[in-house]
Design a protein with these regions (language model features):
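Short, intrinsically disordered N-terminal pre-domain segments
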Residues: 1-22
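Contiguous beta-strand segments of beta-sheet-rich domains
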Residues: 4-5, 23-27, 34, 129-166
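N-proximal, low-complexity, solvent-exposed accessory regions that precede a main structured/catalytic
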Residues: 17-22, 27-30, 50
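Proline/serine/threonine-rich low-complexity linkers at boundaries of modular beta-sandwich domains
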Residues: 49-64
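Short, solvent-exposed loop/edge segments of extracellular or virion-exposed proteins
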Residues: 64-74
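Short, solvent-exposed loop/turn segments enriched in Ser/Thr/Gly
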Residues: 77-83
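Short, surface-exposed alpha-helix to beta-strand junction/turn motifs within ectodomains of secreted
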Residues: 85-119
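Single conserved hydrophobic/aromatic residue that forms the stacking wall/gate
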Residues: 167-171, 175-176
Length: 176
């Protein structure tokens, strides 16, 4: 069992984690590490020490989840559409990768979307934020529109995403 957990598959993460904790459990040189925020402090707890640099042993970093940061805004005022992409290990970003968001056009009218969110922050962490400013009274969205994120949603756009093993991630895809 010396190499238990040395795989990039979700099944390698500790089994007892809640769904929320699985998204915050990342591979680091120490092993599987759980990141938590308590008050204003960011804490990391080593859950499983592998005896080897897990961030190197698991291969290319993978997207484990994508969440919308902004869930609603007033169309008359405009707002920022943001999403957070979670990787299973820390990554370094250069340039401006992009995230595509599909608009189902459920509201009145048609022809809205897709929306392209540009990389905004998060390099050297496992959480990358992508954002798009939408101006006041813009036709980009309408009431009742449903926005979704597909499987092949991240494009490098001439930039790079590199994991701790210095592997350039050529086609970041979400797991579902």
């Amino acid at each position: 069992m010396a190499l238990w957990g040395v795989s990039d598959a979700d099944e390698s993460k500790p089994k007892y984690l809640s769904d929320a904790d699985k998204k915050n459990c990342i591979a680091k040189s120490e092993g599987w590490v759980l990141k938590k925020t308590v008050g204003s402090r960011n804490l990391e707890e080593i859950l499983v020490a592998t005896g080897a640099d897990l961030s190197v042993g698991i291969g290319q970093a993978d997207i484990v989840e994508i969440d919308f940061v902004s869930t609603a805004f007033d169309k008359s005022d405009g707002g920022t559409l943001s999403a957070k992409v979670f990787f299973n290990e820390n990554v370094t970003v250069s340039g401006t990768p992009q995230l595509s968001v599909t608009n189902g056009n459920e509201g009145t009218g048609s022809g809205r979307g897709p929306h392209v969110l540009s990389y905004a922050s998060g390099s050297t962490t496992n959480e990358l934020v992508f954002s798009l400013a939408i101006g006041a009274a813009n036709a980009a969205t309408n009431e009742n529109d449903v926005l979704s994120i597909g499987a092949n949603c991240v494009s490098l756009n001439g930039g790079t995403i590199v994991d701790l093993s210095l592997i350039h991630i050529s086609e970041p895809t979400r797991p579902y």
